[in-house]
Amino acid sequence: MDNSIEGWKMCRDKKDELTGQVTTLTKKLKDLAIPQEDPREAYWNSKYPKKTIVYKRTEKDGNYSIDVRNYFQINDFNLLKIVEDNKLNVGTFDERALKCLNWVKANITYISDKTEYGISEFWCYAYQTLKHKKGDCEDGSIVLANLMIIAKIPYWRVRINAGNVSGGGHAYTTYCRETDEQFVVLDWCYWYKSIPVSERKLHSEEADYYGIWFSWNQKYSFGAMETMSGMEGFKRVK
């Protein structure tokens, strides 16, 4: 009888020990688990063909072929300070997006590359645009997109586009809003609108925005154009 009781206790203790080990192992596996991609992220990142988009940029020491994704510089302290000082990271994603747009509109003055730099096309990095406080359409769009991501809006919701609009070639930011998980235009210089994000037309419904040559977010670039050669000689929107 004593032996049976002792044996039962040993089995119980062993069971408790194994249960504890399983619990610990399960927790460790959860901690190591790779986060699953948001299905909306997967959808929008696969809706259009991915392409390598290279911008030919002229520097003092020569010409460089730059992957357009390098225009995202979300660790720049100037951008981080703007977001923090102006509380651009407060509110819903839609509210943050609009606050970022309004900040760019209020603080960056539009000027053509030809007037500012003497050449028809020169894409500035965000820190350059912030220093000069002025820039062409793509310059403000690049600042806007960076601010939005630093404001903790998921990267896949933020996209910079280059293409045709009514009047010529243009670069602008689009945003996948929370309202219906569809993209809308956030344009800081061409038909700027201060209306709430939820009240905007879908990008696809905007009558004055035509075909896109290419677009990109922080991780991927999309479109048929593999270099910027297709932009040469295009008529830029004033």
Task: Go through each PLM region and give its residues.
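A structural boundary/capping signal
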Residues: M1-K238
